[in-house]
Amino acid sequence: VACVDGRGTGGRGTAFSRSIYCKMGILEAQDQIAAARYLGSLGYVDSSNIAIWGWSFGGYTTLMSMSMSSGVFKSGVAIAPVTDWRYYDTVYTERYMRTPQENNDGYIQTSPLKKAADLDGKLLIISGTADDNVHYLNTLQYSEALVQANKQFEMQIYTNRNHSIYGCNTRYHLYTRVYDFLQRNLK
C-alpha cells in the first residue's frame, strides 16, 4: 500500500501547492500514475495488479487516474467522487478553478464525465444518497456517462447515508464490499 501526496498538497511550498490552479485534478492524477508506474517497476511489485482507491477528492482522483492511464491500474474504487466541478461547492472549487465562465476549458478538461470513455480497468463506485458534500448527482451523471460509453462497472449505493457513509452496519458493509471487489479483480 502506498499513499502518494501529489502536486497540490501542502507542506512543500507555494509553487508545489499552486501548480494545480485552474486545472485541478490533472497534475494530481499524473502524479498517481507516475507513482504506480514507479512502484510497478520494483521487482517485488506485480505491475499487472495495481489498484487505486479514494474517497471524495481521492475518489475523483481515482476516476481521473483510471481515465488518463492505459493499463496502469487493474482496478479502482471511487467513493463519493466529484465527477464535475460544476456540481461541487463553489467556495472550494472557485478558489482553485475560478468560475466556469472564467475557466470553461479547465472545467471541461478536469471532469471525469468527459473522460468516461477512456476509463481503463475495473471500477467500483460507491455513494450515499444523502451526501450533502459531494451530491449524489455526481455518481448518477457519471454512471450514465459510463453506460453511454459502454463501460462496465460496479456500483454500491447507500440509502440515506451522507458523505461519511456510516451508521449501524454501513461502514463494515462498505469495507467488506471494497475488500471483496479487490479480491476478485486483483489476481
Predicted regions: what they are:
Residues 119, 125-127, 131:
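Short beta-strand/loop motif that positions the catalytic acidic residue
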Residues 132-141:
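Conserved alpha/beta-hydrolase "acid-adjacent" motif
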Residues 124, 140, 147-187:
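C-terminal catalytic histidine-bearing segment of alpha/beta-hydrolase fold enzymes
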